[in-house]
Every structure is written in structure tokens, then in C-alpha cells.
């Protein structure tokens, strides 16, 4: 039976604004996820809940230096956690907390798994691990065992929450197609990617992510081999402990888009030109202003021509190519035997060369229909539809952030959920960038989408984003929250930060409370799993 939060009656001695605020507070405190906070009706006292450690640094909007300050005095694993990107994106094969615990325990050796944090995070992790131990205050609970600790080598580990078997904790998924979603005139190339799962043991739920082990661009690989003076067919020992040809290593195993500091140090040590060697060393040590910034391996080989390391030495120093995660855009109840993704193909100019995103262009350009691609499912523990099918949901997902909400709507339709659905979507131009327009328009017409608000930033002189549409609908948003609505955000970190600020301002204004109280209200919703984010 669904839980219905109490509502302040209209004849109660409160103003309309006071009633709205109280209704919202009651819905947040006593709603479906918060009912456990209500006073127990049993005479016997409830057992005291186990203390849960707070992580004040676990916020991607907080700067790295401030995150480290907030973790001062904590156990080493907590300091390591504070150095990470705080996105819990799973690209490292862990969550931020469990990756830090694995590093602290020694079960994980690689410092470069935090893809969003990049070299900045890796360098801080290295400093923290190499620093002498200092007195810390203990964690309030024992750290969870690092996932896959019983396996030897990070490449062989199977991470907690992954579904899949075989090499690198994966199972083969058959690539089917990558249809372009943008129309003519768009500046973007967004693909609707479909994998067939009928010959694999991969199974997913809405809210999960799909991990893809992509291959590096063949043209980039051949250019690197040529600059190194190597032979693609020669066998090398790979950084993941395997042995294969140089071409295969640079294509499937090594991260050549983001050379590790260790690889840059190898180049520095093998550059007879003193100026080049010093500049490479500055890059490896992360000195501000060291050039070229954000260079891939070919950039470095072109910029520092005297650096000619032995091929095996360089390959051993490169990092392992990490999988890329994509929010799943389908419900298995609606598209049996398939998984759908929404992928923005990344292409840009850098250092005088055309650059490509590793996984996005692999899916958009190079994956062949029917090809088996190593893949896995990353379980979502904190991005799930409410179990109460009558609960309303508000989804905010511009651009490719709309992917999980396409899945949510398919799921709600499949299970016959009666709760109202509200989608905020935005992109550049309506004529060319309204992703899944026909589907969402049909859902709006037939009532599955009770509300559909659109923000196309470049269709008018002033830029308009989803947070502007949210402010225009402030009163109704507050009303939905007062009725127990669940909030979901998916998309880029900067967008999520702006939306979070807009939500706090809306709640403060409509609820007649301070901004600080509004942020506390949002934090309460998050604790009750009524405010969930999938941010990258």
C-alpha cells in the first residue's frame, strides 16, 4: 500500500505560504522514503541506528583544495577519497569511497583510475600515499572490503556492482547500430546506440549504466608506432600483465589519449635535448603552465622529437585504457534483448590536430554491426525509480542527460505506473537537437508525460537553459515536491551544479525559508532518495 503524507488542512491557522511550506516539509520528512523517521507506534523503543560517517567533501562542486581541507584529520582512506572527483561514476571500477579504501589497504595499486579527476587527482593520490603517516581520527565504521581484492592485478578484478564475466570482468555484447539523432544543421553528432544482449549474460535495470571497453583510433595507433620507430607486429608486455603485439597493446590495452605521468617521465629520461627533457619533467610533475596541456601520446612525440624511448619501456609505463560508462536509455521491459545508449560523439581540434573521444567515436564510427564488444553493467544503487508507482517524478536531463529518463518513461509505461511524470529537456536548437522528439511528444499527448518543458539555448538572442524553465515553473515545482515527488538530474557536472542552485532558490522562495534551510531541505530529500543525481 502506498504511503500518503499528511496534508495541512485549509482551515488550519496558517497562511497559504505557511501551509505550502509545512506540506513540503511533511512530505520530505514523512514521505515514502522518510516514513522510517516518523515516531514508532510500538511501545518497545526502536533500536538506535548505526552511526553513519559523514563525508562533507563528497560534493563534485567543491574545489579539490577545499575537499582536502574538509578531510583533514580523517583516516588515510578518507583523505584519498577527498582527492577524487566525487562523482561515483564507476569508471574506476569502484565508488569514490571503495576506491580510496582499496588504495589505502594496498589491494589496489593504480592511482590513475579516477577518469574525471585526471592527472590532478592522480598526483594528489601519489602525494598522499607517499606522505608519512599522521595522527587521524578514526572512521565511524569499518571500511568495506575492496571489491575484487582476491584477484591478482587490477585488469583481472571484477568490481562490486558489475554484471558480466570473462576478460576484464566483461561479457560480449553485439553492437547493432548507431543512428544519428541530430538533424541537418546541428553542430552536434549524437547517436542512438543499440547493443544486442540475447547472446550474453548481461542483464540490467533502468538507472544502471553500460560499460564499454572501446578501442583506440587505428590512425592514432599507427601514427604513434611510426613516431616510435616500432613494428606493430612485435610482441610487448602490457601494463595490465598480458602480452600481445605492439599494435594490439596500443589499440586495446594502453591509454594513449591521456599518457600517465610515469610515461611522460620515461620520455623525459630518454630525451637527449636538455630543454625538451626539462619541459617533459615539468609536465610529469604537474607544474602550472607546463606545455603542451592535455596532450595525448602523439602530441608529446611530435612536440619533443628527441625523446625516443625503447618501445617496451614506454608501453610498460602507460596506463591501462579504462572503460567508458553510459547511462542506459531503455527499459528491458520494453526492449527485450537490447540495451540502448545516447552517445555524443566527441571531436575537436587540439594542438593542430583533429582529436576524437575514444569510446564515443568508436561507437559512432568504427564499431561494425554484429561485432562483439566487451561490456558490463554498472549497477545503480542511488539512481532508481521510486518503488511506489503512484509517486510523481521530476526529471531534469538536457542533452545526453535525457538518456535514463527515456528509460524511466518506458519503465513507467511498462509497469502501468500511475504517478505523474515531468521532464525538463534542453539542447541548442529545437529544429535539429530535440533528441527523441517524436517519442516524448507522443508521451506528452497521451498523458504519460504530464509536463514537458523545453529549453533550446540558441533559438533566441539570450541563452535559455533548463534552470530558467524551472524558475518559470517554481510554484508548480514546489507543489509537486509537497506532494512527495522524486527529483532526478542527469548530465554534465556544471549543469547539475546550476540546477542544484536553481532548485535551492526555488525552494527558498516558494517555501518562504532561508537559502540555507532550502539546501538542508534538498539534503533531506537526498538522504531519503527523493533527490538523485547521475552526474559526469
Regions found by a protein language model. Give the residues of each.
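Amphipathic alpha-helical packing elements
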Residues: 80-87, 99, 204-205, 210, ...
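C-terminal accessory/binding modules appended to enzymatic or scaffolding proteins
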Residues: 67-79, 83-88, 174-176
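Short beta-alpha connecting loops at secondary-structure transitions
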Residues: 65-67, 84, 107-111, 423-426, ...
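FNR-like FAD-binding dehydrogenase module
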Residues: 2-10, 14, 31-61, 123-536
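Short, charged low-complexity linear segments at domain edges
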Residues: 57-78, 120-121, 125
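Aromatic- and Gly/Pro-enriched helix-to-coil junctions and flexible linker segments
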Residues: 20-29, 34
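Local cysteine-cluster metal-coordination motifs and their immediate loop/turn environment
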Residues: 84-102, 111-127
